């Protein structure tokens, strides 16, 4: 008999995470690697765990993630968003908890484009009075 799986897609900056929740003992596998090995920073590992901690389901599901694009921060945010959406499909009663924690909102902040005549998005070339 096939296990019940819950899917969720998360996005952050230029990262996209496709998340599957399967009932298990709480392992998190990202792109075929354990998430302790994949994400080198403890703070970002906590970001990934936030939805599971908020809904008190930390040891109930195995999380299988396929993520691409962006860097560590973007990928961690995308995974968090994807896990939140998948948990919502698993149990709609988590909506209020996840919403209050701000985990269902897509973080719309993106890198600002470089403008012509400037060195970066806002950095102007050095000004010389004389």
Curated annotation (Swiss-Prot):
GO terms for biological process: translation. GO terms for molecular function: RNA binding; structural constituent of ribosome. The keyword Transferase does not apply. GO terms for cellular component: cytosolic small ribosomal subunit. Keywords: Ribonucleoprotein, Ribosomal protein. PANTHER family: RIBOSOMAL PROTEIN S9 (PTHR21569), SMALL RIBOSOMAL SUBUNIT PROTEIN US9M (PTHR21569:SF1). Belongs to the universal ribosomal protein uS9 family. HAMAP family: Ribosomal_uS9_B. This is Small ribosomal subunit protein uS9. The gene is rpsI.
């Amino acid at each position: 008999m096939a296990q019940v799986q819950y899917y969720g897609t998360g996005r952050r900056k230029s990262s996209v995470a496709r998340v599957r929740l399967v009932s298990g003992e709480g392992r998190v596998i990202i792109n075929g690697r354990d998430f302790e090995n994949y994400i080198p920073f403890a703070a970002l590992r906590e970001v990934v765990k936030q939805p599971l901690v908020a809904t008190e389901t930390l040891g109930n599901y195995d999380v299988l993630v396929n993520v691409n694009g962006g860097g560590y921060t973007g990928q961690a945010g995308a995974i968090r968003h994807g896990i939140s959406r998948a948990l919502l499909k698993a149990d709609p009663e988590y909506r209020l908890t996840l919403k209050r924690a701000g985990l269902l909102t897509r973080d719309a902040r993106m890198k600002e484009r470089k403008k012509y005549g400037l060195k970066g998005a806002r950095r102007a070339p050095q000004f010389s009075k004389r």
